[in-house]
Amino acid sequence: MFDSLNIFKKPENSQLSESLDQLSKDYLSSSASKKIREAIDFADKAHEGQFRKSGEPFITHPINVGLILVSLKMDVDTVIAGLLHDVVEDCDIPLSDVKKKFGNNVSQLVDGVTKLLQLDEKMKDQSQAEHFQKMALATAEDVRVVIIKLADRLHNLKTIEHLPRDKQVKKCRETFDLYAPLAHQIGMHKMATELEDCSFKTLHPTRYKLIQDALEKNNLDKKTLISRVKRSLNAKFKKNDIEAKITGREKRVFSIYQKIKKKKFSFADIYDVFAFRVLVNNGADCYKALGLIHNIFTPITGRFKDYIAVP
């Protein structure tokens, strides 16, 4: 989802800034994009002389967080708060300076992310996961705070190889126990699966590679396949006067691993590597669409479930 932005590829700071500026212009006003550029400059000065474990200037992290938020089409205040989320905690910048420069909304979001970090540090193990989710939503007040924190966590996972192994394991388990469930809870399922996949890759690199290699061995042009299936279904539905919205995706490595583990399958037994969703207007059209789908694709015996009749 987020890799298509060419983030996490270690480009120069100016390239990251330009990418963020360009992407923000796709859906935000010119005045909003100008504020984002001002926030980048503010964060750059605040983090001057700070470096990540990779040796990169620290500013690459908040800019990447901003890129993730822009890819989610978040509002300008959320993007700015993402850019500034570490300036109060890690720099000698008072929250009042953030408020004076970028307004009350941004300062409240930045403050909320700081409080979430403090809450995170109090959580010791999985038994507190449900409590963390409740406290995170209560502490944040504004769900945008949680979204910024999830974007922050995602970029940190994408660059986690520079941490000592014990810290990698801690962060990934914490993500599985706390942050991925929190993302699911607020309806950000794509973000949740991205977090799970990154954590799984770090915790179990051999298992991840085995599944990834098996997927690539199929030599499927994924985009072409998804596009072809969608075109085929759309043509069939249009011919039969069914209005439908069709989306398709390749399932994530961790999702496939869970199925292999739960069902005790081998990879060869996993048929649903790709998932398609068909949304129609009513139940009658749903059954009609299903019949048309079965005319195109033969159902596998014993693998079909009717969640309309039996939710």
Task: Please describe what each predicted stretch is.
Residues M1-A275, V280-P311:
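Active-site helical microenvironments for divalent-metal-assisted chemistry
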